């Protein structure tokens, strides 16, 4: 086994971080657990083999809400017992009467007791209702990022890798799972003890175990690139058939990744488990991957968006088995090495298995726009964000670490070439397997393979906050002048905020003899650059072909008109990615004051017959974004914007129809459902009538009345236009179903209501146990999109803040989500002071980033309204929407 000795990202960072003392280092853990799912308590014993690095009479390790019964330390022929055990700052400090000499191997034995948590962190319980209506419980784990310390005493830092041997004793009717395969199971007096094989060298945050009544489906890897091994999807009884898609895809994906990475999957099995209560979307525990129900279960009739989402999540988690598990970031400031790469790899793999889905087209409107949106705020953060305290870690599980991180990977892979990139990744994995790395290790491998200085060119992309807008103008000498400056959504960049120069691949697309050509190697590495082009190119140039660069492009109004017409007259010139990216850039830049919003509206009107789903959906999203930002403005302008969105969406909805045919492909199913939802919500008579009819039939028991692709849209439209009857019917649907997708559709739809009475009833659901804690934010998402919802939600949240927080786990990202949805819906700067006033006496350290990002979003929206309201009004009047 090749092992890389962990290194620090920075000695200064380690000095300032709240890390454990370095006098001892764990080598191996023997962990025994005895959970009781009736009392929700458990006993345990951990025996840790330690490498003693310094003379020591004190040992400090992590632990939260664990009661240590005794503490024995053995080395050589000596055994001593702790003279003092103290707790605090998420640590357990053990004092011993004797000193263990450096260079010893010692064994620490700690029996302990604890409660099985209810908070979706550490070792916790999850509930479900079985087919007989009985509430059942299972016990599972969520260790990432720093909750292993909630489950057992340990050294809970990613660089402190060790091996683990686990045995668990529980009632014999339970299935017991852990990272490795069970090598022995014994039953005595109604109790079953499962002992698992020793793990690979791994970080504590990847450890997992589950005790539950489960059933499973099983597939085997093809055996082409890794040994033939079982891949199982476990579910609570009655759901295993819905795990077939994920199990089969998982088996193929493990083999595929083994080939791509040049490193066979090292474990003898891979289990994937659907957990009823789960704070995140999924968790990549090595060999025992856990998921929300809605991230892994699908049926033959599931909506296209659901199937694609499950495929993406499964492949994301399995990519982690290499990027994150086999090779792990040194510390959490390198989280992007895990999440950015796994995100990119999931799209890479999805494109391999389902090329007809054309996922790289939607990547531009999904990951790229998510990254650009968050990173345009002053309160964004670098991809490699300094982390000094553990409570900061959960706040960087966001679109910067995931989406921007993956966009950096995509940008590099496009520039050096995919084959070269993959070979560099293989070198990186081979060199650092079972070890820890920093970003420079990745760049070194890619530099060695490509022959280019990747480390220098990519430095600012991971170390600095933000990204540039590239402004293009034409000189009198027939040249293109390209300048870069930092982009902020408020459009008010200060000189001191505009000091970073980014390396930006220009990917300049031009017309040559009527055909598209792309300069793949042109880059901007200074503040500005001039490029000589011919006359034909001057009429047709488009930067950032395929949107592979992480920046926006600002064209003159005249050139934007030329590009919009070229797209109509020569539809093959601008790719789907180009067109979607152009819409996104123009809309975002005009919101920030680079040009007029009327330019966005003109472009969308010109492309109203756009045939591609990704481009059309981006157009609708941008129109709806403008309308939504105007939620507190006059009823006249809101009505006019609604009329515009209705015209664009309804025309396409009627053109495509909303009956689903057997030969409808994956993309057309998404297209039909998207435009149906928009047309219905914005009041198309035929769509509303159809949706209400379908909903009544469904609520009366005819579950086949709604195609799965339309279910969310029908629920939304019914709540918007069906009144009290529909709201009550939807609540009954929610309480009676155990289908996670139906339940999620219900929760999102509740917030669509603009009726104040039913908004209040919807808000009351957030405190009602019938809504799982993991799902509270789903209600708030849609409430935050309309005026009545924003106002009522703020009043409710500020009146019930402690109750609301008590339903949200301390660890994880849920508190940040809730804060963001409760606060970010305001659109005038006057709201900022009242939000600050409310939170002034609150401990906001667990959601400080989310709060600041909300305030920045409000500032950006307020600035947008101040700059653009007159322009929008004029355009709507000139085009007869007002």
From Swiss-Prot:
One of its GO terms (biological process) is peptide catabolic process. Substrate binds at residues 144, 281-285. The keyword Magnesium does not apply. PROSITE patterns: ZINC_PROTEASE. InterPro entries: Aminopeptidase_N-like_N, Aminopeptidase_N-like_N_sf, ERAP1-like_C_dom, M1_APN-typ, Peptidase_M1, Peptidase_M1_aminopeptidases, Peptidase_M1_dom, Peptidase_M4/M1_CTD_sf. Its cofactor is Zn(2+). It comes from the Eukaryota. Its EC number is 3.4.11.-. One of its GO terms (cellular component) is NVT complex. Belongs to the peptidase M1 family. This is Aminopeptidase 1. It comes from Schizosaccharomyces pombe (strain 972 / ATCC 24843) (Fission yeast).
